[in-house]
Structure formats: C-alpha cells, structure tokens
Amino acid sequence: MRVLFLTISLSLFSIIHADDFAFSEFKPSEGTYYVQVIAVDKEFPEDEIPRDISPLTITYLNNGKMEAKFTVKKDNNCEEINLTLEKIDEPRKITTTRHLHHICDTVRTSEEKYWILSCVREFQGTQIREAELVGPNTDENPKALEDFYRFINRERFVERRIITPRQTEACTSENA
C-alpha cells in the first residue's frame, strides 16, 4: 500500500512542469492523468508492487496549490487518497503532502504533457529510488518511453525492475 501511495504521489509530481518556471506561471490542465511505466532501483515484496493504478484527477486550489485525487483498492476496501502538490524554491522540484512530506524531481520529456518523476524515500528501512512516466492518456507514446528509458539508464536503474501498471477505474465504497 505504501509503494502504491508513493507511486501515485510520484505520478502527481510529474504533472508539474520540469522547467524553472514559478509554480504560478505553469498551470497544467486540470483533469485526468495516467501512470505509464514505473522503475525502482531495489527489489520490492511482490504484494507491494503497484500492478493496478487508477487515474489521477488534478484540480487547482484557491491558494495556488494543486490537489491530486486517486483511489486504491486493497483487501476489497476502497480508499480515496488526496494529496496537496506545491512548487518549492528549488528548480524542478515539488513537494507532496498527505501524512508524509516528499520532495521529488520533475523532468520534462520531449513530448508535450509527458513527465518523468524521480523520488527517493525510505521503504522498510532502506532508501529506494523510483521513477515514473506520466501522461494525459493511456496510449503508449514511443518518444516519451524512449526518453524514460534514457533517463533510467542514465540514473542507473535496472531495467528488469520496470513495471507497466494496468490502468483501472477509480473505485468507490459501493463497488469495493
């Protein structure tokens, strides 16, 4: 569940622009975004690997921050997750806040509306790195994927630890 939470969090990070523009100057479209592919640099327990991911819904808040919503389903229970996203003073970095506070790098691909997120966090006492490619639809974009693979090779991720999650509909407590 924690890995899925981080996975979705990372996806949301990528919605924010990768350049040094101020957060208020770049406003990605509100709407739905999809995690295309995920890479991790460490082995994960099989039950923690995010295989199914719901779409992310992005909206702007009155305070200039963004909110990202998605759902997770585990053990037949549905939970809606709300994250707050905020640009920070460091170039190409954003924070996400729910219970924990994470800082991630955002990298723009050569394709419009496709981003790579790269975060470091702790999982079961070990630091892990995770990178995700996020885009505006579920269609495979070869150029964005090529950028992602170049990025993970440059950052020395192991290609056998790449996950292509299945896109699922958001769950509700009624259909859990």
UniProtKB/Swiss-Prot annotation:
Record CDD domains: lipocalin_1_3_4_13-like (cd19414)
UniProtKB keywords: Disulfide bond, Milk protein, Secreted, Signal, Transport
Cellular compartments per GO CC: extracellular space
Listed transmembrane segments: none
InterPro entries: Calycin, Lipocalin, Lipocln_cytosolic_FA-bd_dom, von_Ebner_gland
Compartment list: Secreted
Taxonomy, superkingdom: Eukaryota
Keyword Signal: yes
Tissue occurrence: Mammary gland specific. Secreted in milk.
GO molecular function: small molecule binding
Annotated signal sequence range: 1-18
Disulfide-bonded cysteines: C78-C171
Main location: secreted
Family: Belongs to the calycin superfamily. Lipocalin family.
Cited function: Probably serves a role in the transport of a small ligand released during the hydrolysis of milk fat.
Protein name per the record: Late lactation protein A
